Amino acid sequence: MKVLLIKDVKALGKAGEIKEVKDGYGQNFLIAKGFAKAATNEVLRKYESDKKKEAENLRFEIANLEKLKEELSKITLEISKPVGANGSLFGGVTKDEIAHALKEQSHIEIDKKSLECDTLKSLGIHEVSVKLGHAIHAKFNINIKAE
């Protein structure tokens, strides 16, 4: 019996593979537990069409992330913070503040967990990197000024 694996099965194969198994193992275990479907022509056609749709969605998502990367590379955020008598910042600029400033000034919403920087503790221009997903990284500048 041929089955299309829906989930990874230890010692048999990974999801998406077509395997030849004994009838009892296929019917009573793999199909019954939801690990596989019988590899009929209809199931295989549906699987292929779903795979094509998924690939198209992935291309669309990557194209959108590339556009976002391009937008971010042109941005310089302005953040004002109070400074002490010697010109050093009180505290610093955190990832949360950077994400909030990006949303307020550029209307781009980024999760603070995707920002790759430590707390910025000095005045001036700093470069911040962002993980957008699908191995796409973007960089933008932040200008920290004294209040």
Swiss-Prot record:
GO cellular component: ribonucleoprotein complex; ribosome
GO terms for MF: rRNA binding; structural constituent of ribosome
Xref: Pfam families: Ribosomal_L9_C, Ribosomal_L9_N
Gene Ontology BP terms: translation
Similarity field: Belongs to the bacterial ribosomal protein bL9 family.
HAMAP family: Ribosomal_bL9
Cited function: Binds to the 23S rRNA.
Protein name in UniProt: Large ribosomal subunit protein bL9
Gene transcribed to yield this protein: rplI
